């Protein structure tokens, strides 16, 4: 079967060619794109923290998990969409691929409207449940409500980019996100610093930048290969296809939401430690991206690689791709951990001038980051299993380990050592259990459709 490569659309068949080189070059734009996407919120936090103070920065940090849990649903659906799109592309089934594109557009429109309304209505209630301090409650509510106005754009960009990645194109989404990132910096300067719109200006800058990036992705989808390009008159809810997307995507969505819910429980306990700890953790999660984003990019690349290769029955090539992704991840993580820990005070000083917040943030980093190599195995193995279309087992593994066990460990820590450092130990402890379960499942090959189909009926 010839490689399905289009110069015009930058699509690429990942079922042929040198695996290491393909994963490396495919993951680089993914890393850059994720870095730019996180840059949005990082710039928000820098402007808010420097111009408006640590209370405003804490309000943004306390709002983060609410925003993530809403996006988690769509991220999960995009997994299902990506697996199916990559499979149909690798098989050359372009009519089915067109159905995926247009069903995805219909789902995006409907669910974006519903979640936007719910987010705006229930923002204050959820912040109260999270034990958010009264002094930052108002600004947290304002930030969430304004941010929700960009939900359709954020979802459109991420889902549309997921389709492009499934077709082997990771470069174009990165370029569009870069353009949006530049707009975000300009918007923050104008709305927050120059026009003094406060935390509302930070959210407004995000709305403008995300809308621009989403518009570029939609334009790209509209101008793809005529056999599967987006046409607005074809947008529909293909119920059989939607059920298949939900079959794969809903477990992935639940997995994402479960992780976020468990982190909300963690954040709730952090909120009880005071504004300094809240601000320190908000800054830590930004600093952590230097390590996390390359791992996430490798996971995304591995998932697309697996989806295409499993789709055409190349199981051994899929396994080699998983192993190479882990090797790459360990090498990159070793370097990034060393840099972050060596320059910890400088990194946290980017977000605040408060010496106590910097000290707490650095202490958190020295607890968690030495164990971050575990997250390489977690991300790559989970992405590989999801890429095969087997999302239900990973959901159960994540549910048990990163929700039930994590909350149990947290309760013990808050009883014996209720400090910011104590809370930090929750992450490496639960990573150990999660990686052990994922490794067992991967080695069992229950995800392998060839092996499963070859089993005799009982």
Task: Annotate the PLM regions.
Residues 25-44, 146, 157, 180, ...:
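Transmembrane helical elements of multi-pass membrane transporters/channels
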Residues 54-65, 144, 203, 275-290, ...:
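Small-residue hotspots at the loop-to-helix junctions and early N-terminal turns
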Residues 57-117, 154-173, 280-344, 375-398:
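Small-residue-rich hydrophobic transmembrane alpha-helices
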């Amino acid at each position: 079967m010839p490689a399905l490569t289009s110069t015009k659309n930058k699509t690429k068949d990942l079922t042929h060619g040198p695996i290491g080189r393909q994963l490396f070059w495919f993951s680089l734009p993914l890393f850059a794109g994720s870095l730019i996407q996180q840059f949005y919120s990082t710039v928000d936090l820098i402007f808010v923290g420097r111009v408006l103070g640590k209370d405003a920065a804490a309000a943004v940090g306390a709002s983060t998990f609410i925003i993530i849990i809403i996006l988690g649903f769509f991220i999960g659906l995009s997994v299902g969409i990506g697996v199916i799109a990559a499979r149909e592309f690798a098989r050359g089934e372009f009519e089915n691929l067109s159905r995926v594109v247009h069903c995805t557009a219909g789902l995006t429109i409907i669910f974006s409207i519903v979640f936007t309304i719910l987010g705006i209505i229930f923002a204050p209630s959820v912040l109260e449940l999270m034990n958010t301090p009264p002094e930052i409650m108002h600004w947290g509510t304002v930030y969430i409500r304004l941010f929700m106005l960009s939900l359709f754009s954020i979802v459109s960009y991420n889902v549309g980019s997921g389709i492009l990645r499934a077709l082997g194109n990771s470069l174009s989404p990165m370029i569009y996100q870069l353009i949006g990132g530049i707009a975000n910096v300009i918007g923050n300067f104008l709305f927050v610093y120059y026009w003094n719109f406060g935390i509302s200006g930070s959210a407004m800058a995000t709305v403008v930048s995300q809308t621009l990036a989403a518009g570029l992705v939609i334009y790209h989808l509209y101008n793809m290969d005529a056999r599967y390009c987006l046409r607005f008159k074809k947008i529909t809810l293909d119920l059989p296809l939607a059920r298949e997307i939900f079959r794969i995507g809903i477990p992935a969505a639940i997995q994402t939401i479960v992780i976020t819910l468990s982190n909300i429980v963690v954040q709730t306990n952090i909120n009880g430690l005071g504004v300094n700890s809240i601000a320190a953790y908000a800054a830590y999660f930004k600093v952590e991206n230097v390590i996390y984003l390359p791992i996430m990019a490798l996971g995304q690349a591995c998932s697309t690689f697996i989806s295409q290769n499993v789709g055409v029955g190349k199981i051994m090539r899929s396994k080699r791709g998983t192993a190479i992704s882990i090797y790459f991840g360990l090498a990159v993580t070793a370097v990034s951990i060393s840099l972050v820990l060596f320059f910890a005070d400088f990194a946290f000083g980017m977000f605040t001038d408060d010496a106590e917040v910097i000290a707490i943030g650095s202490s958190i980093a020295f607890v968690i980051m030495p164990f971050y190599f575990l997250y390489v195995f977690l991300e790559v193995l989970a992405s590989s299993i999801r890429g095969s279309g087997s999302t239900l087992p990973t959901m159960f593994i994540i549910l048990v380990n990163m929700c039930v066990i994590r909350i149990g460990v947290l309760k013990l820590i808050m009883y014996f050592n209720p400090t910011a450092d104590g809370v930090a130990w929750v992450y490496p402890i639960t990573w150990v259990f999660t990686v052990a379960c994922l490794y067992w499942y991967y080695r069992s090959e229950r995800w392998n459709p060839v092996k499963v189909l070859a089993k005799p009926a009982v």
